[in-house]
Amino acid sequence: MSSNSFGKLFTVTTFGESHGPAIGCVIDGCPPGLALDAAEFGHDLQRRATGKSRHTSARREADEVEILSGVYEGLTTGTPIALLIRNTDQRSKDYANIGQQFRPGHADYSYWHKYGIRDPRGGGRSSARETTMRVAAGVVAKKWLAERFGVTVRGYLSQLGDITPAGFDWSAVEDNPFFWPHAAQVPELEAYMDALRKSGDSVGARVDVVADNVPPGWGEPIYGKLDGELAAALMSINAVKGVEIGDGFASAAQKGTEHRDLLTPQGFASNHAGGILGGISTGQPVVASMVLKPTSSLRLPGPSLDTAGNVVEVVTTGRHDPCVGIRATPIAEAMVAMVLMDQALRHRAQCGDVGTITPRIPGQIDG
């Protein structure tokens, strides 16, 4: 069956194409009584939006949310919440020359062989434009998690090309267009991206997400493990080619004495596992990372094929991001938040009455 829906109890279905008249989503399973106003979507949507700096696509969309259902007098009613955003800055003529050509590194070839038809305008359904509605749904999940459990979900760009942060400060993340945690490096990133854009090439990136105050117990072994669903959610984002939970692939070089997260009455001594053991949250910060490939939308010509199998030279015109990772932080946050809300509701449904005599310990030792 088609896979345009996400989640089990907190379910999100997105629809629409990059250059269609609108994009939207239907959120089902949100508990009633959550205060919700259209203006609340603006902050995260603008964090994801294009046209905010010279380092992202020049496409400018207002991204104003219309709430069509599921909210009455400012409160969710428990019925499906339908959200709509109208596309206003499509430039489909930029894609006129590639309607019968396959852009290397894009979903053109695979979509063509699956469906026998594709919408070439801006990538159609495979465009990152679709993630706008994930961010919108993530606003709902973030708010519910914060109000119900005090959970916060925050992300940052942890690598741009071969550049990594020289320091870390959460307060710096929202003060630059890269979501970078070390303010002193922003000029270096600006210069790097200016040179990259001038060359016509692109580059990959890495985004880290941290969810604080997640209670222990969320996750459904065996096939609904929290880390498994986080990995699937992050892998569903455009251009993502790798996901880590906690130390991830670095665990291969670690000894057990290093990787194990010791428990003490004062708290966990470390968090190499990323706050998840056995597929269940431990009460530590949940830490997930994703790596995004360099975009294949390049001004540099490259050989390819057309739908008839003829050799062609493809040059991608239009407005594109030289690094899709720059705008990916709010998307990753949204996916993590939606997984956590879905798992919270599922935990409440099955194990809401479960209690233990074991005291909860802090997620980490203070100091």
Curated annotation (Swiss-Prot):
Covalent S-S links between cysteines: none
Top EC class, one word: lyase
CDD domains noted in UniProt: Chorismate_synthase
Keyword Chaperone: no
The UniProt record lists the keyword NADP: yes
Cofactor(s) demanded: FMNH2
EC number, as in UniProt: 4.2.3.5
A GO term from the CC aspect: cytosol
Name used for this protein in its record: Chorismate synthase
Lineage, highest ranks first: Bacteria, Pseudomonadati, Pseudomonadota, Gammaproteobacteria, Lysobacterales
Gene (name only): aroC
